[in-house]
Amino acid sequence: MTRQVALDKVRNIGIMAHIDAGKTTTTERILYYTGRLHRMGEVHDGGATMDWMDQEKERGITITSAATTCFWAPKFGNYEGEKHRINIIDTPGHVDFTVEVERSLRVLDGAVALFCAVGGVEPQSETVWRQANKYGVPRVAYVNKMDRTGADFFDTVKSIKERLSANPVPIQIPIGEGEIFAGFVDLIRMKGIIYDKEDGSTYEEVAIPHDLENEARTWRINMLEAVSEVDESLLEKYLNGEDITEMEIRKVLRQATLKVSIIPVLCGSSFKNKGVQFMLDAVVDYLASPLDDGEVEGHHPRTEEPVVRHPNDDEPFAGLAFKIATDPFVGKLTFFRVYSGTLKAGSYVLNSITGKKERIGRVLQMHSNKREDIDCVYAGDIAAAVGLKEVRTGDTLCDENNPVVLEKMVFPEPVIQIAIEPKTKADSDKLGMSLAKLAEEDPTFRVKTDDETGQTLIAGMGELHLEILVDRLKREFKVEANVGQPQVAYRETIRAKVDFEGKFVRQSGGKGQFGLVNLTVEPLEEGKGYEFVDAVKGGVIPREYIPAVNAGIQQAMKDGVVAGYPMQDIKVTLYDGKYHDVDSSEMAFKIAGSIGFKGGARKASPVLLEPIMKVEVVTPEEYLGDVMGDLSSRRGHIEGMGQRAGAQFVHAKVPLSAMFGYSTDLRSMTQGRANYSMEFESYREVPKNIADALQDKRVTKDDY
């Protein structure tokens, strides 16, 4: 099977937005217009193709990033009539599923940022935008739901500029808003596009409506000024009053979009079939191909030497596994992006993270949850492999004779945990295996056993995250389980720097044990985790025992000195010690490391930390006082407030422990008229009275 489409005509894109901005409906329309669907599915009737889990269909939200492939030839522009392949990842908008967005953006070359014309920039829009900035992903903005009452295109553009610190440049302006939304003015071609009222999929080109001529001229000048700033020759033409051609505008707009210095803004109503085809044209015109992204850098797994791979079919194969999913028919599916070379079904790949070789059974091109077998994938492709048993999210797959490790993905730590237990003996046998499969799929989901009680604990990014995973246990794995009350994932750290000696000696007949270590224990800045420094000089501790000291310290960090919670953001330096020729062993130094760390941590002003959440509440004005008073009573700190789309919003930082059950309380407080969103912000020190109570609770072993 030869390459269907040249590499410069491939677009790997994500659709990213806040929940309810219309992502899944927009993707459905894309599939319909590109000929992949014969009937359009609607989210509100549970018929959307990209939402294929039962829970997604029930809740009308997207949980997993469904991947699909389609083809599009633009009707206008610099690529007019040329067939392009578009690989789309439909990402979730709920904050509990940010990991799906994060891992999608890592392997994409561009994104369509969707905004609701009524709500504008919402909290999840900010979160996703930050994630896209982190990976330097070029974007076009699509202001959706222009047909809704209260839609305001220009206000949304203003909020993109102010709240996201971006440079939005409209290349269309709407003709009418709300119920009278009829189409838009194309500012590049200076033509009006009016849609057929019945189905919206047909349109006609008209002269710009008389009442919009001045506004269209103003916004065209705004667009020309923005692109002129990027290109000196264009600036000269603009200042001299010369005509700038459509082709020149598109060319420079593309360059600026790829540098993320301009965000082209379009408008439409996906539900009413208006604007989607032109958004597809913009994807082809302005977003990157794998060639624009150029080389990726990695390193050799053994020598750590830098290794560069280019998007070229003739180079050795290198790809990144960005998602693991369990498919009811084919088993474990590994979604991967090919960065260089080609991969045939049936061939072997090296997992350079584990060092293991595995065989690719089949290679599948995914269309939401339907699949199509293909013989070969090429540089720039996104596909799914069957047959890889030990691959984890973020692993590099490569040619065994040319190993490379690509940059790994970093995922946030879970902030909430619950105890889970099987309902019956039959469930008990399946629970462990099923939880392990779910943990394989989702790097922010953790499973552990509490050492004190023997209970199984599951941890995740929020209540909805864990609720859906427990629901999947029941539906997909047929495991019934009872769950306890949610618990906060507290952490511990230290505030001072101390030196401490850890000594383990046992010499009472027979072979003894001897290990002595001198450690410096000090705080690291937030988010740095753990750092171990080997500063031993002159062989006072043999080299083979040093990893054991490190292992002992890490073991001790799992069970903190304040209330037994895991410790974080700590640097430990091993600078001296002693050993015994006969009695020293790895075990002795592991225990000495553990004793030294625990003793040092107790003297280093240890503190208890709790997760603080960034909360936004949107409420009718009459309930504003109640909402703010309630947030303050939850130890919340009000950060700001304002007005948006006829409602008041409040920004606050609140401890997670005070937010359990908040949705129910907010509903009753506002008669169901307010809503809120919440995301993890950082860990902060727990007030002394609460820390004391947690300590007492932990001592009595009633915590779980």
From Swiss-Prot:
Function: Catalyzes the GTP-dependent ribosomal translocation step during translation elongation. During this step, the ribosome changes from the pre-translocational (PRE) to the post-translocational (POST) state as the newly formed A-site-bound peptidyl-tRNA and P-site-bound deacylated tRNA move to the P and E sites, respectively. Catalyzes the coordinated movement of the two tRNA molecules, the mRNA and conformational changes in the ribosome.
Domain annotation tr-type G: ranges: 8-291
Sites where the protein binds GTP: 17-24, 90-94, 144-147
HAMAP family: EF_G_EF_2_B
Family indicated by similarity: Belongs to the TRAFAC class translation factor GTPase superfamily. Classic translation factor GTPase family. EF-G/EF-2 subfamily.
GO molecular function, one term: translation elongation factor activity
Protein name: Elongation factor G
Tagged with keyword DNA-binding: no
Highest classification ranks of the organism: Bacteria, Pseudomonadati, Chlorobiota, Chlorobiia, Chlorobiales
Pfam name, any one: EFG_III
NCBIfam families: EF-G (TIGR00484), PRK12740.1-5 (NF009381), small_GTP (TIGR00231)
Predominant localisation class: cytoplasm
Record-linked PROSITE patterns: G_TR_1 (PS00301), G_TR_2 (PS51722)
Keywords: Cytoplasm, Elongation factor, GTP-binding, Nucleotide-binding, Protein biosynthesis
InterPro entries membership: EFG_II, EFG_III, EFG_III/V, EFG_IV, EFG_V, EFG_V-like, EFTu-like_2, G_TR_CS
GO biological process: ribosome disassembly
The gene coding this protein: fusA
Gene Ontology CC: cytoplasm
Cellular localization per UniProt: Cytoplasm
